[in-house]
Amino acid sequence: MDEDLMERMKGVCRVKFYVTDDADGKAQLARWLEGIDKPYTTASLGDNDWAHSWQKYYKPMTVGEKLWIVPEWERDQTPPEGRTPVYLNPGLTFGTGNHASTQLCLMGLEEYVVPGAPVLDLGCGSGILSIAAMALGASSAVAVDIDPKAVDVAYENAGLNGIGRDRYTVRAGDVLTDQALVKELGGQRYPLVLANIVADVIMPLSA
């Protein structure tokens, strides 16, 4: 690990986690706190607080030279001149466009997407990368995520951008262990593979 990063990680840390507000959640909290002699506070969240409160901070953003990432609830705004809109409702999956690694991937798409050719998106989350790739000219995309929730979210986001299932296939599974999934993905060649995921997954795939 990078020494500068390790140095920045030193000091006081605050850890937040969430449990259900019932007997099981309280028992889980008690187990986690065993042997920890540190101050802590608890607070109850309303059913919709955690699921929707973030939306007020998620605003349209320009990325690179061509893309305009737009939350679904702000799609009535007019795209800036020369920008290709990508409409999203990421829900609880990764992929809003705010994260630096996502933005770097989006900027890379502008340079590396092959018009009329398919892309493979590993760790698709909300589908932002593969959907943006098709908005920039890719013919189709196959997307995979280990989180089953990502399948519906990615399909819904594709629909927001006028992309149907004839062009977009989303699967849930682990590409390192699911041999049936690996076989399915291996049935086609992709000029561009998108993988905004941790190195521990990318390295075995590239071997």
Feature locations, PLM:
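N-terminal auxiliary segments of SAM/dcSAM-dependent transferases
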Residues: 1-79
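Proteins enriched for Cys/Gly/acidic motifs involved in redox and nucleic-acid/cofactor modification
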Residues: 60-86, 90-100, 106
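Short loop/turn elements that flank and shape the SAM/SAH-binding pocket of Class I
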Residues: 75-76, 176-181
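Conserved SAM/SAH cofactor-binding pocket of Class I
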Residues: 92, 96-175, 189
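A short acidic, Gly/Pro-enriched loop at the edge of an enzyme's catalytic core
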Residues: 180-192
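Glycine-rich, N-terminal phosphate-binding loop of Rossmann-like dinucleotide-binding domains
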Residues: 197
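A short, conserved alpha-helix within the catalytic core of class I
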Residues: 200-207
